[in-house]
Each structure stands twice: as C-alpha cells, then as structure tokens.
C-alpha cells in the first residue's frame, strides 16, 4: 500500500504541527500546503523555528521557488488560494485535506476542497454539522462514504477518552468540566477589541480569563450516552502550551478513588494505549510538552469527596497531541476506505 497523501489548508499553529507529524510518519506523505497570507520563504522560517516545540532538526527545509518547498529531498507544492474551490489538490496528488484555517468549519464550506480534487476533508476544529470523531472513542463509527469529518477540539480529545472509561466502568450521572487552557492565537497580547467576548479581549499574558467552551457538550456528540450529562467552561491562563482538564462527576456505581485509578490505568495500558496516559509522579504542565497522547490522567491530582462524587484531572499538549490525532484519524479513514 502506498503512502497516504495529504494537503494542508492554513499553515498556522495546527497546520504547521500537523506537517511536522506527517513528515515524521513513515506512512504519510505531505504533498501540498495552501496559505494565501504567507510566502514560501516565511513559511519555511515559521516551520523551522517554533517557540514552543523547538527547531526542526529532522532534515533540511528550503525554498525551491515561489510554489515549491523542499523537505529533505521531498518537494511539496505551495499554493496561495483564498478560495478553497480553487486549490488544485488533485494536481498535487493530495487525497486527504486537513482544513486548519479555522474559517471553513462547516460541511458546506469545507466541501469546497472536494471541488479541487480532494477525496476527504478533516476539519481540525469542532464543526456544527460535520460528524465529529475522537480517536480512541468513536472513530470506528466512521463510514467510508463520509467525505467531510471533524477531529473535534483538543479539549474534547482530552475529555472524551477519560469520560468514556469512567462511564463504561462506573456510569456518569452528570458532570462539570473546567479546562485550564494555555493561550491560543485568537487572544490579545495587550487589551484590545473583542466584541463577542469582552473578557477575551484582555491581555493574554497578564490575566486568568474565564471563557466559554463547547468541549464538554461535544462529548455528547461522540458519546451519545453522555448527551446532556456534561457541560463546562474554560480559564485561559498565561502559559503558551499544555492545558489540563478538571472533570468532576457524580457516579452511578459507587467506587473508591483507588478503584477509579486502577480502571483508568488498565485502559491506558490496554485498549487506549497511546491515547490515554496515566501518571503518578509529581508533574507540572511543561512536563507534558511534546506528549503525543490525547489525555494523561494525573492520579495524584484528583480527589474524591465520596464514593459517588469525584474530581479527575487529566493533562494534554493542546497543540502536539491534537495534531498527532489529526494524522491518526486520517490513517483510520484510509484503512476504512
């Protein structure tokens, strides 16, 4: 079987990291990138140097011309189309397109990529109408006739595997989630206008900012048994990467905290290995930087009030872990098609 050929639309935080994951994968080939706002020279610079994840050291990256980058010996086509319909994915050989602009997140808008010859589109954000898949939770429900999917959000990818284990083993009556979330590109360096979210317009590096998130409700889309049972909110905090979920739930079946830990550890070492992690060391956020797992349960940080009411804590590298799952989802789709 040949390599899985992918294209990336939008070379921002997630686009560049998906490219890094793809270029380190034996079975995936990056063939094209589209971004109308940056030149190939600037694209190369942004790819090579990353404040959070460090300098790219796997092979040389250079510009061949205004429409081609060279990664090692591999040429990658570069396009600058604003309209997704105009991107010649087929000409570049891209079968799967990662839609990572954050703009074309509904099915109709993402479908524009199919007109350029893409066969499948993976939206690297939640979508109001595209089916959402979380690897390790519901990806097996993907059917090969579905052409546009969402990889959900980084927070849903952290929360869903944990919620699945707890619900499968003990049953969740209801729960509330808080994510303590690193800064993202939509925030402001200094106080600035943000008409839809006034607090979100305040300086990111000086404030803890309460914010909304649909991540908990979205779990109900990937785990229908939990629909209407979870909701949550976020605090944006002044760190550049790695976030942490606090899930507080009421259980159907009474269980000690040790029993809950044992169940999570068993799944983390079994069916969910590589997706769900389990740690007992005294770790802090930077210890999870570059961790490719979706959700790393912190056994020491959680606490139980009673045998039916418990707080669970799970870490995630909201950039690297999520970008790794985008490629994993494409792999699964390819194996199904």
Curated annotation (Swiss-Prot):
Write down the Pfam families for this protein, in alphabetical order: Gp_dh_C, Gp_dh_N
Under which pathway is this protein filed? Carbohydrate degradation; glycolysis; pyruvate from D-glyceraldehyde 3-phosphate: step 1/5
Q: Where is this site: Activates thiol group during catalysis?
A: 181
The entry's active site is: 154
UniProt GO molecular function: glyceraldehyde-3-phosphate dehydrogenase (NAD+) (phosphorylating) activity; NAD binding; NADP binding
Give me the Gene Ontology terms describing cellular component.
cytosol
Reaction(s) catalysed by this chain, per the record, are: D-glyceraldehyde 3-phosphate + phosphate + NAD(+) = (2R)-3-phospho-glyceroyl phosphate + NADH + H(+)
Q: Which SUPFAM superfamilies match?
A: Glyceraldehyde-3-phosphate dehydrogenase-like, C-terminal domain, NAD(P)-binding Rossmann-fold domains
> What InterPro entries does the record point to?
GlycerAld/Erythrose_P_DH, GlycerAld_3-P_DH_AS, GlycerAld_3-P_DH_cat, GlycerAld_3-P_DH_NAD(P)-bd, Glyceraldehyde-3-P_DH_1, NAD(P)-bd_dom_sf
SMART domains associated with the record:
Gp_dh_N
Q: Write the record's keywords in alphabetical order, separated by commas.
A: Cytoplasm, Glycolysis, NAD, Oxidoreductase
Q: What Enzyme Commission number(s) appear in the record?
A: 1.2.1.12
Q: Could you give a single Gene Ontology term from the biological process aspect?
A: glucose metabolic process
Q: Which residues bind D-glyceraldehyde 3-phosphate?
A: 153-155, 184, 213-214, 236
Report the function annotation for this chain. Answer: Key enzyme in glycolysis that catalyzes the first step of the pathway by converting D-glyceraldehyde 3-phosphate (G3P) into 3-phospho-D-glyceroyl phosphate. Essential for the maintenance of cellular ATP levels and carbohydrate metabolism.
What else the UniProt entry mentions is: Plants contain two types of GAPDH: cytosolic forms which participate in glycolysis and chloroplast forms which participate in photosynthesis. All the forms are encoded by distinct genes.
Give the matching NCBIfam families: GAPDH-I
Question: Partners and quaternary state?
Answer: Homotetramer.
Please report which protein family the annotation says this sequence is part of.
Answer: Belongs to the glyceraldehyde-3-phosphate dehydrogenase family.
Q: Supply the name of the protein.
A: Glyceraldehyde-3-phosphate dehydrogenase 3, cytosolic
Q: Mind giving the lineage of the organism this protein is from?
A: Eukaryota, Viridiplantae, Streptophyta, Embryophyta, Tracheophyta
